[in-house]
């Protein structure tokens, strides 16, 4: 049997991905399909953590621009990520995958607090861990959460599962028909070229901690498995190219 390229991964999902075609709210059938895709990889013995954005329920920056206090707006967004985490955890449990939600803001009735050692033990025991509530502080995105948690759990790679986007381009392919897709980039290329795969804090964290980043289209069945086994799909960002 072919050995996987990545044995411990952190999958970063946008909140909008949970909304399906509507783009807002949560579509349970869409989440269930994602859970089945994730289970397929989990059943191969891959250790999996998840970070899910909250943009399907709330976006802090526009609220702040409209006059809301930025700190309060960001905390509201963190609660949205917990809602998404709980829904995904339920879907994973329903397909037979033992799952734990850990939050950076304590809410004992619904989730465990984030404790690195406990998260690592869950992964080692074959449980999926979903990290909610960002890093618990305003002004930090869920991309930064993904990079930080990936470093803390010593993940081999962050899988940026995009909704209908099959990689990183030098221009917006929806607006520019001449846009060229990159198969590979270094983290330094991403930062120097200003490619907005993640925010700059997340990109720097990934580079400094030598974590591969794979940007791929999550809408094509089997793509998570393909990435894990090293097939060339999407765009791979690494220090080692």
UniProtKB/Swiss-Prot annotation:
Q: Which InterPro entries match?
A: AceGlu_kinase-like_sf, Asp/Glu/Uridylate_kinase, Uridylate_kinase, Uridylate_kinase_bac
* One Gene Ontology cellular component: cytoplasm
Q: Which GO BP annotation is one of this protein's?
A: 'de novo' CTP biosynthetic process
In terms of domain of life, where is this protein from?
A: Bacteria
Q: Name one Pfam family in it.
A: AA_kinase
What Gene Ontology molecular function terms does this protein carry? ATP binding; UMP kinase activity
Q: Where does ATP bind?
A: 12-15, 55, 59, 163, 169, 172
Gene3D superfamilies assigned: Acetylglutamate kinase-like
Looking at the record, which segments are called Involved in allosteric activation by GTP?
20-25
Pathway given in the UniProt record: Pyrimidine metabolism; CTP biosynthesis via de novo pathway; UDP from UMP (UMPK route): step 1/1
Residues annotated to bind UMP: 54, 74, 135-142
Catalytic activity entry:
UMP + ATP = UDP + ADP
Q: Where in the cell is it found?
A: Cytoplasm
Supply the EC number(s). 2.7.4.22
- PANTHER family this protein is in? URIDYLATE KINASE, URIDYLATE KINASE PUMPKIN, CHLOROPLASTIC
* HAMAP family in the cross-refs: PyrH_B
The family assignment reads: Belongs to the UMP kinase family.
Q: What is the name listed in the Swiss-Prot or TrEMBL entry for this protein?
A: Uridylate kinase
- What gene codes for this chain? pyrH
